[in-house]
């Protein structure tokens, strides 16, 4: 059986189809929302418009790659996180499309959250499907979150720690835009950082399971003002994020020893961060970029699990 996943975040419009019999992603597609040069994202009304405009053509594209008449359930990100009061208008576009698709074919509609989708995609891509059936520590690190979560699969989520101010993705994007790169700027910051061969010594602020990243933006601005080049400052920024995650992860492992640590969210696409963290955190799981950044893959997988059509316990 096939399941369809839809996610309309503040960064991208994403669709995916999952085959429950094969346990594989049949296809997925994503379109980043257009952001004007020099701007740090979109207003919610603009994001909602761009999602609404993009979805019909993207469904046509998906239909050319998978037989959508075989879809038996539809999953959608209806809000950012599975906590009370979590809401962003941009997700209404996905809910509208998913509702129309499901009603037209009398299919079950499973409303999920953007964060659950990130977690499920990362658990799947980690290659150990038992992660869906046991506890793990999961970092969701993006432009809207720097969350440390205790998860049982992607369904039961307990927040453990977060940033008290700026999110990691915001720090990366603000640096990238300051350097003249388009938003979202993570890929460009990573490319610049890879050019730096100098040693960098990150300075971070972590207290227990809570971090502060507001100082990172100021540190990067000062480094640029002091004459450091873009590659050095980009490397400094990413390694500060990496060191922050290392300290939070090891503090969490002191309280929850032996658990796997899974890293999800767009910022976790950075090769530099992955290398830095995996050398310092035991049992760390990073995944390929398309499973880390915004996607609908995790939503399509969770739709299958909600319908008991992909029981990982039997694998």
Whereabouts are the PLM-identified features?
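N-terminal phosphate-binding loop and adjacent alpha-helix
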Residues: 33-66
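Conserved phosphate-binding catalytic cores of ATP/NTP-utilizing and phosphoryl-transfer enzymes
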Residues: 1, 107, 111-136, 301-305
